């Protein structure tokens, strides 16, 4: 039987390794106990507590869960209040206006006139808004009812006309109250009763100058051109509108030349949004009054 000889130094190193392993195990156990002291109910020694420690509180789990659900519900309601970019119709409008602005800059760099560029841009913007932002049905019905009420009031006023015994001054005041027109225009001259021949004369003179452009004062202290074609209205509707201008029916009955620029300005200021944006209303009233006085003086 062979004998195995063990070196004493190897035994000593093995014992040292065992002692180190035991110390390592003891250290690991101590660290585990320290880290799990809060689970065993052992108080933890803290040298310095945070300043906001008083604000900490222990709440019931169910109560905290209810509060969290309530806060989430409120956040959901806030999100419902705001529309997303796909739902907000003003987002594409802003993009469209940015594109129009870039187009205006490019045209101005090529040397085109500013008033021409601006007039076209305004027309495009108005058309875009009218197409993408239609008026509500309730508003249209309210406008129709208001217009019907005004027509009934005018019919009642015309049926209760003053007698012949009243003076001419009272007739003039009544006609000036019933007639309509832009502010600043003097309605002292009254219209006489018209018939088919008067409407035919008015329509004839307007048709002859339907595409002729007239100068009007603009908001930018300049002028711009406008004609009857840009009203996008039927000739019969234009004739009915201009009959409300004082003196027009009398001049048409006498076969006189009519103040077409005054008539165009009156109709456009009431029925054209683009014209309302471009024109200087104060200067327009004075211009129409001057034209009317000049034609009535002949």
From Swiss-Prot:
Keywords: Chaperone, Host cytoplasm, Host nucleus, Host-virus interaction, Inhibition of host innate immune response by virus, Inhibition of host interferon signaling pathway by virus, Inhibition of host STAT1 by virus, Inhibition of host STAT2 by virus, Interferon antiviral system evasion, Phosphoprotein, Viral immunoevasion, Viral RNA replication, Virion. GO terms for biological process: symbiont-mediated suppression of host innate immune response; symbiont-mediated suppression of host JAK-STAT cascade via inhibition of STAT1 activity; symbiont-mediated suppression of host JAK-STAT cascade via inhibition of STAT2 activity; symbiont-mediated suppression of host type I interferon-mediated signaling pathway; viral transcription. Residues 61-80, 144-192 are annotated as: Disordered. Residues 156-180 have a biased composition (Polar residues). Changing residue 163 to N: In strain: Isolate Bat/Denmark/V002/1986 and Isolate Bat/Germany/RV9/1968. Belongs to the lyssavirus protein P family. Non catalytic polymerase cofactor and regulatory protein that plays a role in viral transcription and replication. Stabilizes the RNA polymerase L to the N-RNA template and binds the soluble protein N, preventing it from encapsidating non-genomic RNA. Also inhibits host IFN-alpha and IFN-beta signaling by binding and retaining phosphorylated STAT1 in the cytoplasm or by inhibiting the DNA binding of STAT1 in the nucleus. This is Phosphoprotein. The gene is P.
């Amino acid at each position: 039987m062979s004998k195995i000889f063990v070196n004493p130094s190897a035994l000593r190193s093995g014992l040292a390794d065992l002692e180190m392993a035991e110390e390592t195990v003891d250290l690991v156990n101590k660290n585990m106990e320290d880290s799990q002291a809060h689970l065993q109910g052992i108080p933890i020694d803290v040298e310095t507590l945070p300043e906001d420690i008083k604000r900490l509180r222990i709440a019931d789990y169910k109560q905290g869960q209810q509060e969290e659900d309530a806060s989430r519900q409120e956040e959901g309601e806030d999100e419902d209040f705001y529309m997303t970019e796909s739902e907000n119709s003003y987002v594409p409008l802003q993009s469209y206006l940015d594109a129009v602005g870039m187009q205006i800059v490019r045209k101005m760099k090529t040397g085109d006139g500013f008033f021409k560029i601006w007039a076209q841009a305004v027309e495009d913007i108005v058309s875009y808004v009218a197409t993408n932002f239609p008026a509500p049905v309730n508003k249209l019905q309210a406008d129709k009812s208001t217009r019907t009420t005004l027509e009934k009031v005018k019919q009642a006023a015309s049926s209760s006309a003053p007698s012949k015994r009243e003076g001419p001054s009272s007739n003039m005041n009544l006609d000036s109250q019933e007639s309509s027109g832009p502010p600043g225009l003097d309605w002292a001259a009254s219209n006489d009763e018209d018939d088919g021949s008067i409407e035919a004369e008015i329509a004839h003179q307007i048709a002859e100058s339907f595409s002729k452009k007239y100068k009007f004062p603009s908001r930018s202290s300049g002028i711009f051109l406008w004609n009857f074609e840009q009203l996008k209205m039927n000739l019969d509707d234009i004739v009915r509108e201009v009959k409300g201008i004082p003196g027009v029916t009398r001049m048409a009955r006498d076969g006189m030349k009519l103040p077409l620029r005054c008539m165009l300005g009156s109709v456009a200021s009431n029925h054209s949004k683009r014209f309302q944006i471009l024109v200087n209303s104060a200067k327009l009233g004075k211009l129409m009054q001057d034209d009317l006085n000049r034609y009535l003086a002949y």
